[in-house]
């Protein structure tokens, strides 16, 4: 007679074993209809799972995040069902859930087209409309292997042979005549899978290994209802308009080319944004009392072996040889900063020592993962390392947190998710040291009034960390900032200081990044602002335009006055209609368009328009310079009204 305890603490007693679905039906028909799966004693299970003893149970529906993942996974099976009906010769590989959707890798003797994708989606809709039951059967390893071998599913057989223990009982999910294999759970009926969209196709090597066969990957998205699907597709459409690669080309910010994959060719306007970001962060470094240093971008393999990076990052490092020595181009800055710390005897009085660098790093990322500015091989980190005592951790981490929010707030990012990752099973250092370190990070977060998600076991082996994830205007997540404690690297590289007891001690090292990589952050900003960079970041802040040749000299004079005041301005003297000029510079996202006709020349003024189409009237030139300068210097805190 199992007693089922529900999330609200209420209990229900049954005279015999019951399934998750039985319990949902006992609560009410509405919940039974919505039930996708259950969480029994903390473990996700199918709705058909029998509960034979007392247990806690949460009914999972599509409104739950877990329910949405289950729904998406079942849509991957639905895709497999449709593929096998249209092209029975297809061999199915894997079909996992990803952010906002799913994909399936398939081996087919023809290349799929956009028309095929449309046909697949149509067949999926027709199958889902049948609202058929999904039947789960747990079978022996051998029985599962026999099923897929008989169907010619060589990839499923390989998964069984290489990834599933012989004493395991794989779950086979029956979608009418189609069978797929999965640990589950999956939806009990396809009525839950009506709101999906196939999106695109790409190539993917089997098991991600370029030595294996190239498969075809089909991507899709799935949601709980029509409204959610429509909203997501609208966000995708908006994201496409904001694509930094597209805007970067329109605004002539940068380019990339095949001869230097993953490396950025910055053009003048893009480099202007880059340097403004550097200047901004450099000002914050001074405000928060950092030293700025510069380390070499290439060091001997011996140093990377001592730091431990050679063992863990060798495949991602670019190397070269000279005079029988092997060198590696740095993938990160920390070992170099320890070398700078090691120059000269350090006392406890010298701590905390805060060391920052705009470090040029390189990582040999797989070519298939490269994506504009978001994923590159050559990048610049706004990296810092703080050497301190254990007693100083909380105060230093708290200052890092304040700096992170100070910087993000300037760019208008307010939705920031904070995660605290604690000790993993495999780690160095004593439990007491980890206790103190984790407590210091948690205390610093609380001190700054921040809520955080705890991620047990997700810290690095050398220390706990805090992660800061930005959510942009399209609610996409970008993990940028980190504050990471390191008990290992200083000791490995011989960093010590003399304590009050006149003994040598190894300092604690705090790795701190805010923007992460400047290249990636510029990509994020480009999409967040849709290219409408705030005035202080805009490559060209104002364009002065004459109406006729009579005002050309005056336009040049005004542009010079703006530039002399430290603003970035140009004069557009082309013999074009003023409306044409305004439209062109609006498309270039120039914040202010300054127009001068005979009236403005005579009055010593300038007519001001914004890129958003607002007519701000006429201003004396000196007054406008003062207003624009104030907006730039305050980084948008005091705006010229748009």
UniProtKB/Swiss-Prot annotation:
What the entry lists under InterPro entries is as follows:
aa-tRNA-synt_IIb, aa-tRNA-synth_II, aa-tRNA-synth_II/BPL/LPL, Anticodon-bd, Anticodon-bd_dom_sf, Beta-grasp_dom_sf, TGS, TGS-like
Residues passing through the membrane, by range: none
According to the entry, every stretch annotated as the TGS domain falls at 1-61
User: What processes does the entry annotate via GO biological process terms?
Assistant: threonyl-tRNA aminoacylation
Catalytic activity as recorded in UniProt: tRNA(Thr) + L-threonine + ATP = L-threonyl-tRNA(Thr) + AMP + diphosphate + H(+)
Record text on cofactor binding: Binds 1 zinc ion per subunit.
| Assembly | Homodimer.
Identification of the protein by name: Threonine--tRNA ligase
* Gene name in the database record: thrS
């Amino acid at each position: 007679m199992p007693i089922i305890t529900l999330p609200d603490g209420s209990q229900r007693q049954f005279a015999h074993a019951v399934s998750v679905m039985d319990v949902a039906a006992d609560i009410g028909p509405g919940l039974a209809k919505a039930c996708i799966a259950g969480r029994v004693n903390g473990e996700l299970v199918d709705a058909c799972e029998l509960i034979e003893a007392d247990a806690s149970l949460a009914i999972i529906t599509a409104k739950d995040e877990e329910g949405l993942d289950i729904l998406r996974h079942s849509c991957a099976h639905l895709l497999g069902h449709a593929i096998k009906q249209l092209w029975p010769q297809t061999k199915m590989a894997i079909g996992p859930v990803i952010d906002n959707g799913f994909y399936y890798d398939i081996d087919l003797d023809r290349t799929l087209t956009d028309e095929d994708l449309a046909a697949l989606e149509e067949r999926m809709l027709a199958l889902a409309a049948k609202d058929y039951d999904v039947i789960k059967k747990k079978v022996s390893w051998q029985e599962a292997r026999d099923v897929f071998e008989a169907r010619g599913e060589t990839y499923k057989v390989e998964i069984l042979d290489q990834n599933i223990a012989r004493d395991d009982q794989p779950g086979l999910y029956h979608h009418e005549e189609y069978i797929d294999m999965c640990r589950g759970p999956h939806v009990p009926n396809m009525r839950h899978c009506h709101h999906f969209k196939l999106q695109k196709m790409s190539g993917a090597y089997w098991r991600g290994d370029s030595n294996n066969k190239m498969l075809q990957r089909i991507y899709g998205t799935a949601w709980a209802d029509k409204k959610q699907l429509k909203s997501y597709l609208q966000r995708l459409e908006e994201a496409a308009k904001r694509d930094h690669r597209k805007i970067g080309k329109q605004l002539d910010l940068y380019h990339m080319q095949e001869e230097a994959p993953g490396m950025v060719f910055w053009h003048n306007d893009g480099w202007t944004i880059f340097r403004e970001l550097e200047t901004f962060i450099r000002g914050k470094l001074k405000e928060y009392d950092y030293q700025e240093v510069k380390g070499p971008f290439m060091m001997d393999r011996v140093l990377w072996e001592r730091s431990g990076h050679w063992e863990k990052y060798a495949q991602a490092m670019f190397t070269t040889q000279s005079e029988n020595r092997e060198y590696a181009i740095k993938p990160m800055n920390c070992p170099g900063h320890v070398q700078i710390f090691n120059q000269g005897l350090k006392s406890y009085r010298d701590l905390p020592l805060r060391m920052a660098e705009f470090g040029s790093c390189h990582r040999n990322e797989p070519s298939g993962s490269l994506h504009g500015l978001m994923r590159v091989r050559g990048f610049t980190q706004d990296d810092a390392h703080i050497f301190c005592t254990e007693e100083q951790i909380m105060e230093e981490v708290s200052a890092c947190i304040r700096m992170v929010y100070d910087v993000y707030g300037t760019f208008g990012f307010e939705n920031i998710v904070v995660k605290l990752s604690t000790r993993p099973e495999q780690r160095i250092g004593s439990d007491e040291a980890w206790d103190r370190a984790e407590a210091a990070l948690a205390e610093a977060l609380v001190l700054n009034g921040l809520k955080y998600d705890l991620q047990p076991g997700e810290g690095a082996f050398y220390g706990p960390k805090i992660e800061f994830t930005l959510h942009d205007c399209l609610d996409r997540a970008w993990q940028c900032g980190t504050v990471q404690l390191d008990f290992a690297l200083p000791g490995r590289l011989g960093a010590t200081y003399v304590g009050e007891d006149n003994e040598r001690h190894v300092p604690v090292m705090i790795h701190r990044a805010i923007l992460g990589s400047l290249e990636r952050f510029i990509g994020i900003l480009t999409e967040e602002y849709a290219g409408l960079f705030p005035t202080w970041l805009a490559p060209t802040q104002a364009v002065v335009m004459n109406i006729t040749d009579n005002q050309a000299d005056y336009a040049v004079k005004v542009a010079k006055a703006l530039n002399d005041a430290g603003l970035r301005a140009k004069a557009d003297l082309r013999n074009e209609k003023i409306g044409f000029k305004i439209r062109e510079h609006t498309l270039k996202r120039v914040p202010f368009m300054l127009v001068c006709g005979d009236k403005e020349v005579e009055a010593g003024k300038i007519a001001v328009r914004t890129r958003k189409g607002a007519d701000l009237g006429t201003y004396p030139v000196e007054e406008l310079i003062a207003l624009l300068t104030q907006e730039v210097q305050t980084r948008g805190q005091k705006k010229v009204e748009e």
